[in-house]
């Protein structure tokens, strides 16, 4: 995590020290990040009339959501760290407003944990689950930015296809008791984890799944290419 933060700070330092154009920097906030476990803050430097550099950092904060697992409700807490840097080109005549295209690079870490409540062969199971996702990605964002009274920015991320090199793994251990699983319980645990993963469309057919019967644990792992899509909105203030 330290290297992306350092890169983020170095870029900001470079821009503030070398910009000749009256930049009018914009400070932005993307509220949707709160639902995923991050405070997403950004800045845009309009270094030429139609050209900007945009930087975002996602600061991890805890977010809890309820998921369905084995026909029961379970809570999962997640946190996200992210860094994004993009070069934005506006199509219209006004600076920092109108339609734009923005190639970007990003780094993202997503961590989640929680207890999945269920049953294995009619016995109570409590799956202590941890997931870890890390990815480097690149994409192109198409969007539209409104500039109200030359100060308030409303930025809409309309279409943003991206490509990622990712690593994902998870570990789910039954902590209900210390008795080893039977073969039937092992098979049921694997099936239940597969069903839970099916809610993640881009991962469900790619994961390698293994079961350690004596440790009462299900492992999943994936390394490789993953497609992605960026959309959303932010609100900002232009200085």
Predicted regions and their residues:
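Bacterial Sec-dependent N-terminal signal peptides
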Residues: 1-23, 235-239
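Outer-membrane beta-barrel biogenesis signature
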Residues: 15-28, 214-218
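Outer-envelope beta-barrel architecture signal
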Residues: 21-27, 39, 47-53, 95-101, ...
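Long, hydrophobic N-terminal alpha-helical segment
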Residues: 25-30, 34-46, 56-58, 73
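Transmembrane beta-strands of outer-membrane beta-barrel proteins
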Residues: 26-32, 56-58, 99-106, 157-159
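Extracellular/periplasm-exposed beta-strand and loop segments of Gram-negative cell-envelope proteins
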Residues: 29-30, 57-84, 110-135, 163-226, ...
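Residues on the lipid-exposed face of transmembrane beta-strands in outer-membrane beta-barrel proteins
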Residues: 41-45, 85-89, 103-105, 138-146, ...
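A contiguous binding-surface segment within folded domains or other stable secondary-structure elements
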Residues: 89, 94-146
């Amino acid at each position: 995590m330290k290297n992306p933060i350092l890169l983020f700070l170095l870029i900001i330092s470079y821009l503030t020290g070398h910009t000749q154009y009256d930049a009018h920097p914009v400070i932005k906030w993307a509220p949707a990040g709160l639902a995923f476990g991050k405070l997403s803050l950004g800045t845009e430097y309009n270094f030429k009339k139609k050209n900007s550099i945009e930087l975002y950092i996602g600061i991890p904060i805890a977010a809890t959501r309820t998921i369905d697992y084995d026909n029961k409700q379970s809570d999962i807490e997640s946190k996200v760290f992210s860094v994004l840097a993009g070069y934005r080109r506006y199509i219209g005549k006004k600076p920092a407003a109108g339609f734009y295209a923005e190639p970007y690079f990003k780094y993202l870490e997503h961590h989640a944990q929680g207890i999945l409540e269920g049953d294995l062969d009619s016995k109570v199971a409590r799956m202590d689950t941890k997931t870890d996702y890390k990815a480097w990605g690149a994409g192109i964002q198409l969007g539209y930015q409104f500039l109200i009274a030359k100060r308030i920015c409303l930025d809409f991320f309309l279409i943003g296809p991206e490509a990622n090199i990712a690593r994902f793994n998870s570990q789910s251990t039954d902590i209900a008791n210390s008795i080893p699983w039977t073969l039937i319980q092992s098979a049921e645990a694997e099936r239940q984890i597969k069903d839970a993963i099916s809610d993640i469309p881009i991962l469900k057919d790619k994961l390698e799944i293994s079961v350690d019967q004596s440790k009462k644990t299900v492992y999943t792992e994936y390394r490789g290419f993953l497609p992605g899509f960026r959309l959303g909105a932010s609100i900002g203030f232009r200085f």
